[in-house]
């Protein structure tokens, strides 16, 4: 391996300096850890370019924070709530998702709350959601990929020919020539700490914020005067009527997201304690007492500003890279652009750029 350690980055729009998607001269193996949108996008581009790609995901299904909670006759998006599209490549992808009925525009009535006044939002930004839930685009992107769910990678080891991956669900070490980590920054830093310290330091510089999510179920439709509410006072920061999104069926469900500060202060609380403390916020926001609630804690829900301003990071010396929304401004579109950018860096590296 080269003695110099070069950490190369691409711009935050996800295009990078190299846009030619030329594959390797031989069919090289790539291990992608994390099946959120960034990992799936990176994997799909690399596979189309001729790489042999395997994606490892510790959860039962792909999607990352594009996920929904479900029970008997109800379900609710409890992570990412919607996405927008500005990047031309991502706009094209969203158009394809809409054409294939796995996404649709969300014509939501949005408002904001400052603690005393409910103010309707009059913006024209178009928002999209997955159909029948936010995980649908990730499931569509995973089609045709070698995806190993319920497989947690616990250890990485450098080898003469690349990498060896070990973890729960793997009877033996899995070899790979190239490595992609599509994980939240703290997880990536911990996994790379001894195997690729330069990459680990990049991830360790990023601080991510937690969020408590509460799914509230009601016996009948609730008319609060809005479908999505940006809350600028109190413990909550966002409320959404999940049932207002296209393709949703079942019981009336609403999603509550707590602020990062409140979530951090209550990170050790039980779900029942969180529900008890957040429900008193609802009457002022026009919501009645729910029939039942579920609560879930997101350890890394968003990136604390300032975030790393690069769409991806590639370390040629270790043949490993990082991608994720936290590298490209956050949000669903950022995840897509980051995955694209890293795939481009890898293709350029194998095409002879070696940076």
Residue ranges of model-derived segments:
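N-terminal Rossmann-like FAD-binding beta1-loop-alpha1 element of flavoenzymes
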Residues: 28-55
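Glycine-rich FAD pyrophosphate-binding loop
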Residues: 47-71
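Central helical "cap/lid" subdomain
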Residues: 63, 71, 176-226, 288
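N-terminal FAD cofactor-binding segment of flavoenzymes
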Residues: 68-110
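A conserved short coil-to-beta-strand element within the FAD-binding core of flavoproteins
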Residues: 149-163
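Active-site substrate-recognition segment that forms the wall
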Residues: 215-267, 273, 277-286
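Flavin (FAD/FMN) cofactor-binding core of flavoprotein oxidoreductases
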Residues: 282-318
């Amino acid at each position: 391996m080269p003695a110099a350690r070069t950490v190369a980055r691409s711009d935050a729009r996800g295009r990078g300096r190299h846009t030619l998607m030329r594959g390797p001269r031989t069919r090289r193996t790539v291990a992608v850890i994390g099946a959120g949108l960034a990992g799936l996008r990176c994997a799909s581009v690399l596979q189309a370019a001729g790489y042999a790609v395997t994606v490892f995901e510790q959860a039962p299904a792909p999607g990352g924070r594009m996920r929904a909670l479900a029970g008997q006759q109800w379900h609710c998006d409890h992570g990412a709530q919607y996405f927008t599209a500005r990047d031309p490549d991502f706009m094209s992808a969203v158009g394809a998702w809409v054409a294939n009925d796995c996404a649709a525009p969300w014509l939501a009535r949005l408002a904001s709350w400052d603690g005393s006044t409910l103010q309707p939002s009059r913006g024209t930004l178009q928002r999209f959601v997955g159909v029948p839930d936010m995980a649908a685009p990730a499931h569509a992107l995973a089609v045709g990929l070698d995806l190993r769910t319920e497989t947690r990678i616990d250890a990485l080891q450098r080898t003469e020919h690349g990498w060896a991956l070990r973890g729960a669900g793997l009877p033996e070490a899995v070899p790979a020539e190239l490595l992609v980590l599509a994980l939240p920054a703290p997880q990536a830093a911990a996994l790379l700490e001894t195997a690729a310290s330069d990459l680990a330091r990049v991830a360790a510089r990023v601080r991510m914020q937690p969020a408590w999510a509460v799914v509230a179920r009601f016996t009948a439709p609730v008319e609060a005067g809005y479908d999505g509410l940006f809350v600028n006072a109190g413990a909550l920061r966002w409320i959404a009527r999940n049932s207002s999104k296209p393709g949703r069926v079942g019981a009336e469900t609403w999603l509550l997201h707590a602020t990062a500060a409140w979530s951090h202060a209550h990170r050790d609380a039980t779900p029942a304690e969180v529900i008890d403390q957040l429900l008193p916020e609802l009457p002022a926001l026009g919501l009645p007492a729910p029939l039942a609630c579920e609560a879930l804690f997101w350890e890394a829900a968003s990136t604390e500003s300032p975030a790393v301003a690069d769409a991806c990071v590639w370390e040629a010396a270790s043949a490993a890279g990082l991608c994720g929304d936290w590298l490209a401004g956050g949000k669903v579109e950022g995840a897509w652009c980051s995955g694209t950018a890293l795939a481009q860096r890898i293709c350029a590296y194998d095409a002879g750029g070696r940076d």
